[in-house]
C-alpha cells in the first residue's frame, strides 16, 4: 500500500491528483468511512484503507464516532483533486445506507462493487478502445463517447459478441444491486478513463 502512503503523505494543501489507482483508493476510503459512520463500526482493522487514511492524515475522530470526519475529509479530496461533485458522493451515501443494514453486509457490498468496477472498466476499455486515442484535451468529446458507451451497456441488447453480452448482463445486475444510476456510472467511468490516459503506456501499445 505504498502508493496510498505517497498520496496521503503530503500536506493536503499541496496535493496533486494522482492516477487511477489513487482515485480508486479514495473511493474505497469514502465507502469505508460511510460504512463506519452508518453502522457504528469501531474496529479499524476491518477497514484497512480507512485506517491508513486516518493515520496518515491524522484525522481526529469526530463526536466519538468513526467515519464522520474521515468521510468529510475524503469527500473534500475527491472534489478538489478529482472534481467529483456532491451528487457523486451523495449517491454513494444512499447506496450504502439502503444496502448495508448490518456489519455483515459490508463484505458482500464491497465484493459487488469490486466486480462491478472491474467488469465495467474491462468492457468500456474494450468498447472504446480506438476512441480512447482521442487526446485528453478533447474532454467534451471523450465525455460524450463515455456517455454513449455507458448508455449502450445499460440499454442495448443486440451486442454481437456473446462474451460482451454476458459482461453487460453482469454489469446491469451489479448496478441494480448497488443502486448506482447511469449518470453516476458515466461520471465514474469518465474520470477513470481520463486518469488512465495520463498514465504511461506500455511498450506493446500503439
What spans do the regions from the language model cover?
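Small-residue-enriched hydrophobic alpha-helices in membranes
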Residues: 2-60, 67-206
Amino acid at each position: 500500500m505504498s502508493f496510498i502512503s505517497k498520496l496521503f503523505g503530503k500536506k493536503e494543501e499541496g496535493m496533486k491528483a494522482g492516477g487511477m489507482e489513487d482515485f480508486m483508493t479514495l473511493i474505497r476510503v469514502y465507502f469505508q468511512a460511510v460504512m463506519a459512520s452508518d453502522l457504528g463500526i469501531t474496529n479499524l482493522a476491518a477497514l484497512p484503507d480507512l485506517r491508513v487514511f486516518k493515520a496518515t492524515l491524522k484525522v481526529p475522530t469526530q463526536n466519538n464516532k468513526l467515519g464522520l470526519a474521515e468521510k468529510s475529509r475524503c469527500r473534500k479530496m475527491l472534489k478538489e483533486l478529482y472534481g467529483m461533485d456532491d451528487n457523486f458522493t451523495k449517491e454513494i451515501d444512499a447506496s450504502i445506507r439502503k444496502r448495508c443494514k448490518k456489519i455483515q453486509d459490508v463484505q458482500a457490498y464491497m465484493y459487488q462493487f469490486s466486480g462491478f468496477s472491474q467488469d465495467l472498466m474491462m468492457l468500456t476499455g474494450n468498447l472504446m478502445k480506438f476512441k480512447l486515442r482521442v487526446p485528453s484535451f478533447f474532454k467534451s468529446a471523450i465525455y460524450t463517447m463515455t456517455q454513449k458507451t455507458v448508455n449502450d451497456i445499460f440499454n442495448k441488447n443486440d451486442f454481437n459478441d456473446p462474451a460482451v453480452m454476458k459482461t453487460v448482463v453482469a454489469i446491469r445486475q451489479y448496478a441494480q444491486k448497488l443502486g448506482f444510476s447511469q449518470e453516476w456510472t458515466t461520471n465514474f467511468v469518465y474520470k477513470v478513463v481520463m486518469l488512465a490516459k495520463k498514465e504511461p503506456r506500455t511498450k506493446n501499445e500503439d
